[in-house]
Each structure stands twice: as structure tokens, then as C-alpha cells.
Amino acid sequence: MILAIDTHRERDELAFTLDGEGRDCLLRMLERARRERDHEFDLPDVEPGWSRRSGYDQCEFINIFPCMPEDRCTISRGYGKDGISSVEMALTATSLDAFIRMLERMGSGEDTLAIRPAAGSPFTLRLAAAE
């Protein structure tokens, strides 16, 4: 499961805390994004399991879809009355490949992976609080 998502506003950083199952789910999602560049799709196989400390209660991956290239990668956050309600992260194809390589290097135990902005953005990863 994804154990926590922490945002560090001062560094514009998004940190995923994952166990082996969460790592595998995230890896499958990103590999699918790399293969299906022209399609928006849902990810019903990813289980909710977010930590309260990062402002999430029960959340899930909603969509990953292509977007228009931008000058640089953006990480934007939406805030509800109880904290963060959504996170969007745009990735270039190069950043997507780098993200996949980082996940592949992670072990099967609990670990944290920090993501920072990079140049360009043909992909957007959107996470949102479940209703």
C-alpha cells in the first residue's frame, strides 16, 4: 500500500512512503502510462490506504493522462477544510522513465521516494481524496 504522501511546500517536493505492494502498484501505473500515451484511464486495482498525517483519509489513484507540454514540471495541490484533497504532478517522458527506474531500485520493504519538479510535462499524475 501507499502508506503516506507528504508534501514539502518549501521544496515543492512530493514524498511517497510505500511498502512492497504500494511500490508494485505505483510501478504498474507508471508503466501503463508509458505504454498508453494517448489514453486516459482509471486504475481500479490500486487500493486506498493513505496516512492521516499527510492530510489524506481514504484516497486512491484516479487517472493518469497526457496533457499539453509545459515549460516545467509542476506539482500543484488542492486544499480542502481537512487538509490536502488533491495532488497533481506533471511528468515528461524522461521524468516518467526516471521515476520508474527509482521504483525498480527500491526494495520490497517500507521506503520513501521523494519527487521534485523537472522540465516539461506531457504526463499528469492526479491523486484525489475518495468521496
Language model: regions and residue ranges:
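Positively charged, low-complexity terminal tracts
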Residues: M1-E131
